[in-house]
A protein has these predicted regions:
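PLP-dependent aminotransferase-class I/II
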Residues: 18-78
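PLP-dependent enzyme catalytic core of the Aspartate aminotransferase-like
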Residues: 268, 277-281, 290-333
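Structural motif of enzymes handling amino- and sulfur-group chemistry
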Residues: 172-229, 252
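Helix C-cap/helix->beta junction micro-motif
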Residues: 37, 102-103, 282
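Active-site phosphate-binding strand-loop segment of PLP-dependent enzymes
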Residues: 51-112, 116, 137
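Active-site PLP attachment segment
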Residues: 125-177
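Conserved PLP-binding catalytic core of the aspartate aminotransferase-like
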Residues: 221-225, 232-282
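Conserved beta-loop-alpha segment that forms the PLP phosphate-binding cup at the N-terminus of a helix
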Residues: 1-15, 23-27
Length: 333
């Protein structure tokens, strides 16, 4: 995200429209751009739970952009996470790209969880920039990542390419020929490359390819759907922060409120204790995490419990997890 955001040729007063559920990986370079270039950030309050649809996000972004333009603001870009690391909501890239194209904007997607989880064709989606982690669902080494940069005008995005300059490279020639410029070669040229680390990432990618990325996506999402239904059976539909019924919004991340006293989800210490006890009180224990985020209309942040369903899990793992979480939530009531 630093490469994408800080390489753009910003002007003072440029506005980036984003959400209030972004990761620090995107917010940090965005805040640097605010102080360094004088850009402005407009944050949309996003919904949580099952009562939302892909059209919700199209409307939220489009209305905000139109309102800003009506105020005389110069909106330059949209930045969003697909999925959000907080609730696992898959903001619909293809749908939001229609908003991008309608308003002639730069598109920046924090897709940290996409590689290894979803079998997306990034060229067909058409975003200008998409950053993905190499060490999450792709299961490569830590400190590796994937950056997708749109390098041509095509049907998926006929907008002119944004002016962008690499911020970390050991090879740069001035006045590059735009038609033949190998932007990937410049971005990946970094002097003393950590060869074993990146070869390990490439090997992990090859393994995923050999299994079949669409097969992995289907398996992960099927397990996630099973988990969500099991949560609804015990805690009710309102316990979910993740949507489950709109296929455009689902991911293999699930976030919910496990507490019998619903307000306990605003207690950070209780959420931390729940995560710690899920690891310590059961054999084998469970590795889950707590994430904090704003909920529209809530008096304080919620500390939801987030669960990942990977290709090495199965339905029996989900059953044992749900039963254990139910028992622990009862013990903590």
């Amino acid at each position: 995200m630093c490469h994408a955001i800080l390489g753009i040729k910003w002007e003072p007063g440029d506005v980036v429209v984003t959400t209030n559920h972004e990761h620090g990986g995107g917010l940090t370079p965005l805040n640097i751009a605010v102080d360094r270039y004088g850009i402005e950030v407009s944050m949309i309050q996003v919904p949580t739970g099952n009562r939302q649809s892909a059209s919700t996000y199209v409307q939220l972004f489009d209305e905000r952009i139109r309102a800003l333009k009506g105020q005389g603001k110069r909106v330059r870009a949209m930045m969003w996470s697909s999925p959000t690391y907080k609730t696992g909501t898959m903001l619909p890239i293809a749908d939001l790209m229609e908003v991008v194209k309608a308003h002639g904007l730069i598109s920046i997607v924090d897709g940290a969880h996409l590689p290894g989880m979803m079998a997306y064709d990034y060229g067909a989606l058409g975003m200008d920039f998409m950053s993905g982690a190499g060490h999450k669902w792709q299961c490569g080494p830590g400190s590796t990542g994937i950056l997708v940069i749109r390098n041509k005008m095509r049907a998926s995005n006929p907008l002119p390419l944004p002016d962008w300059f690499t911020i970390h490279t050991s090879s740069y020639a001035r006045q590059q020929p735009r038609g033949a410029y190998d932007i990937a070669a410049t971005v990946t040229s970094c002097g003393s490359l950590h060869v074993p680390m990146f070869r390990a990432l490439a090997r992990a990618c090859e393994m995923w390819d050999s299994i079949g990325r669409k097969k992995i996506e289907t398996y992960d999402l099927t397990l996630s759907a099973y988990l969500k239904e099991k949560i609804v059976e015990r805690w009710g539909i309102d316990s979910l922060y993740s949507p489950k019924d709109d296929p455009k919004l689902v991911s293999a991340l699930t976030c919910f409120n496990p507490f019998r006293n619903r307000d306990d989800v605003m207690n950070q210490q209780k959420a931390t204790t729940f995560v710690n006890r899920m690891l310590s009180d059961f054999s084998p224990g469970f590795v889950i995490r707590s994430v904090n985020f704003e909920v529209i209309g809530a008096p304080a942040q919620h500390y939801g419990i987030r669960i990942s369903t990977h290709l090495w899990h199965d339905a029996n793992d989900i059953d044992r997890l749900v039963e254990s979480m139910w028992n622990l939530s009862g013990a903590m009531a």
